[in-house]
Amino acid sequence: MKIKNVVVIGSGTMGSGIAAHLCNANVPVTLLDLKTEISEKARERIHKSRPPLLIDKSKINNIKVGNISDNFDVVKDADWIVEAVVERIDIKHQIYEKIFKERKDGAIVSSNTSSIPIKVLSEHLTDKEKKDFCITHF
């Protein structure tokens, strides 16, 4: 499957860095956080970063922003959904529940966790959902 559209949930240091990396590869990204303002600030940080995170400043146009309450429906069109939220398993499980209700069949779902084992992350997923789930730590 060719990845044409990515949603990154969590716009902190890791989430915004992942979004920038995808932009450099010309992959459209939607960056979601609790509030749109948080995602907008992350987009600004990417644009103004020193050293630059973007190969070409115009690539910033590949990043759309939103929030998980009003804009979560973008998950339906994503080929890859990256979870990059705080390292709290309860929050991650809540996000996965929402993702797996919305995502299209076959869309990849990954966590950017650095410390939580995949067995713990996926303990509430069905066998079918587990086939599309992985850890992608950047």
Functional labels for PLM-detected ranges:
Residues 82-83, 111:
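Redox-cofactor binding/interface segments in oxidoreductases and associated redox assembly factors
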Residues 76-77, 81, 105:
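Alpha-helix C-terminal capping/helix-to-coil transition sites in glycosyltransferase folds
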Residues 93-138:
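Rossmann-fold NAD(P)-binding glycine/threonine-rich loop
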Residues 85-86, 114:
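Short glycine-/small-residue-rich Rossmann-like dinucleotide-binding loops
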Residues 1-48, 102:
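NAD(P)+-binding Rossmann beta1-loop-alpha1 motif at the extreme N-terminus of oxidoreductases
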Residues 28-78, 88-90, 94, 127:
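Conserved N-terminal Rossmann-fold NAD(P) cofactor-binding segment
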